[in-house]
Amino acid sequence: MSRTVFCQHLNKEADGLDFQLYPGELGKKIFDNISKEAWTEWQKKQTMLINEKKLNMMEPTARNFLETQMQAYLFEGKEPDIEGYVPPKS
């Protein structure tokens, strides 16, 4: 049986993550407050950011940038600036 959380990103009840996917306090906050659906959306954005900005994930500055973008997207509702990407119209 899956666990349900009130997803802060989607503002609705949804299936929660099966386990903590990110380390530390931020990882706990994500596990407790973000749904599988929102996490999957973030992973797509993350991949586009890494590719578009040519981030080297071995560099601490790149990891810090990505973490800041992740927090803004998941908890503040801010879309990351991905050059050349036009979101689909609803």
From Swiss-Prot:
<comment type="function">
    <text>Could be a mediator in iron transactions between iron acquisition and iron-requiring processes, such as synthesis and/or repair of Fe-S clusters in biosynthetic enzymes.</text>
</comment>
<dbReference type="InterPro" id="IPR036766">
    <property type="entry name" value="Fe_traffick_prot_YggX_sf"/>
</dbReference>
<keyword id="KW-0408">Iron</keyword>
<dbReference type="GO" id="GO:0034599">
    <property type="term" value="P:cellular response to oxidative stress"/>
</dbReference>
<dbReference type="GO" id="GO:0005506">
    <property type="term" value="F:iron ion binding"/>
</dbReference>
<comment type="similarity">
    <text>Belongs to the Fe(2+)-trafficking protein family.</text>
</comment>
<dbReference type="Pfam" id="PF04362">
    <property type="entry name" value="Iron_traffic"/>
</dbReference>
<dbReference type="InterPro" id="IPR007457">
    <property type="entry name" value="Fe_traffick_prot_YggX"/>
</dbReference>
<protein>
    <recommendedName>
        <fullName>Probable Fe(2+)-trafficking protein</fullName>
    </recommendedName>
</protein>
<dbReference type="GO" id="GO:0005829">
    <property type="term" value="C:cytosol"/>
</dbReference>
